[in-house]
Amino acid sequence: ATGDFPRAKLYWNASANKTASNNPFFNVDAPHPYSVFHDFNHENKWVRNYVKRNLKFLLEEYNLDGFRFDLTKGFTQKSSTESNASNYDASRVAILKDYHAAIKEVKEDAFVILEHFCDSKEEKDLAADGLHLWRNVNHAYCQSAMGYSESSDFSGMYEKTPAWVGFMESHDEERMAYKQLAWPAFDSLKGDNNLENRMKQLAVNAAFML
């Protein structure tokens, strides 16, 4: 949440331009290394209730099919660094399962995707609860777009288990067409004169993804 969010402003440290230490909804500083804006304390019962009420409203008011949660690795109060933030965290699993249960209570067939990228045991625990996990296959598709066979294996997209949701590009992993133009493997992909060839190669990528 940003500083304009009312619950952030209720308890605000103006001199530091961030949430105050007595703010029950937010951490002063995120305990994990991936924070954007102000970090919710998902262990707090008020925050938990607030999130659940919002999920319920969105499902009922807009009849959403489900949700994709960004940075669910950060749904924790456990202090971590980049070296251990992905380690198994039972408290984070409990929080996410609680939100998932609240969603299913409103809409049994809701589809929920997590951008998680954590320990395999943790992801398997979440998958066993019916949650789906984001899987990054951007590098392989970029290699293919540029014309390189090395590291262009798409098998990460196709798992026997339905829990993983692979993606070719996202809001974080993008610029495939730029890489194709900047570092092509073949002359037939170089320059403005070969735009049609590059677009055909990208179309093949899309066909494999779909």
Regions found by a protein language model. Give the residues of each.
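Substrate-binding/active-site clefts of carbohydrate-active enzymes
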Residues: 1-63, 68-88, 99-105
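Active-site-proximal flexible loops/turns
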Residues: 4-5, 77-78, 122, 176-179
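Active-site-proximal helices and loops of the catalytic beta/alpha 8
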Residues: 12, 32, 71-167, 207-208
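Short, low-complexity, polar/charged sequence segments that are solvent-exposed and flexible
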Residues: 15, 131-134, 184-189
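Generic secondary-structure boundary/loop-capping signal
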Residues: 22-23, 37-39, 123, 164-165, ...
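Non-catalytic scaffold segments within catalytic domains of secreted glycoside hydrolases
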Residues: 34-38, 81-94, 179-199
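A structural signal for well-ordered alpha-helical segments within the folded catalytic domains
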Residues: 45, 49-56, 90-97, 162, ...
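Active-site-proximal substrate-binding groove within the catalytic cores of carbohydrate-active enzymes
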Residues: 100, 149-210
